[in-house]
Amino acid sequence: MSEILIRNIKRLVQVREPGIDRVAGNAMAELPAIENAFLYLKDGLIHSFGTMDELPSLPTSEVLDATGRFVFPSFVDSHTHLVFAASREEEFVMKIKGATYAEIAGKGGGILNSARKLQQTSEDELVERTLARAHEIIQTGTGAVEIKSGYGLTTRDELKMLRVAKRIGKETPLTVKTTFLGAHAIPAGISHEDYVRQVIEEMIPAVAEDKLADFIDVFCEEGFFTADETERIVEEGKRFGMQPRIHANQLHRSGGVQVGVKTNALSVDHLENIGAEEIEALKNSRVIPTALPGAAFFLGLSFPPARQLIEAGLPLAIASDYNPGSAPSGNMPLMVAFACIKMKMTPEEAINAATLNTSAALAIQHSHGSITKGKIANVYITKPMSSIAYLPYAFGSSLVDRVILNGKIYS
């Protein structure tokens, strides 16, 4: 493996000692950094760092000068639907004209629209289309990503989606974690209870047999899956070795947060509709509350109450929800900007939420999410910037200049 020395870094950001796996509450406002720093990457890992005054003589195959630039750990995007067959901009226009999410779904749009398109698309075609999106998110600073199924809605097509996600992990330098989301919607031609039974009795064992999913997820929402159904499904997934994560409280007070706490989910995601009861439940758990500001922005929903979550001492995370219907962007710097502008998070809180806390939401906090000795060498170098706050402030600018993943310069 090659060695890379990055020198003259204006500010090396998110520098952590080993063992810090998440930051919560008031601690989210603290983002440790080193001024005028160097960072040495060796054998695909973070080897050492410090101030330029402390720079020893090091064997290097490549030296990068970062004068005037910041270096951050790569973003960890803990919630995406990166595998899909086609965009849905026709629904975007319907929304502009006043149609609601539920009305679009009722006319055969929404998730079922994506399912029809995906079922008609070959695995190789899906890989090709998803690869383009994977390289797009790498260029905006993402180094690790969760990818869900959920647009198959048949056993064959759910397995196809998860195989595609696994291939993205092999054919790109991204760290990929996979989630089985068969319980995303009820397909046409089958009763609600019969489909729940199919997910539990047929899909979960098939996914587990092929070792295709790290996690299991359910869209716990009115008109989709109840809290009781969500619990049944994720408990069966746990029996097959899949850790739960739950789509919770996006459109209504669905009970998803409480199910997530009860089933020891890694995360509960969305949270546009939560109150004191849900926050109190989260306070007594290790579940990571995850906001998806891109979806709230795109759908015109209320944003998750970030300040209340942080003031309750919780470790808030931020992910993109990249999908063709409600969040057609995997641009994590933009999500950080939305968190600051619309959720009133400070830049430091938002960066913590999109790196260390999302790594905890994927159970990869020991290898990703911070500048820590021994972690995987996933970092990006910015264009010249004046401060950390400039990243979300200049929300329309592309400020990621160079990306290094697994200790190799991405090009």
Give residue spans per PLM region.
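Conserved beta-strand scaffold positions in the cores of enzyme catalytic domains, especially
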Residues: L5, S61-D65, T178, V403
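C-terminal cap of metal-dependent C-N hydrolases
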Residues: V23-M28, L356, I376-S411
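Metal-associated gating/positioning segment near the N- to mid-region
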Residues: S61-E62, A66-R129
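Metal-coordinating catalytic core of metallo-dependent amide/deamination hydrolases
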Residues: S114-R129, H135, G143-G255
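Catalytic core of soluble alpha/beta enzymes
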Residues: Y195-E209, G223-E311, A327-S329
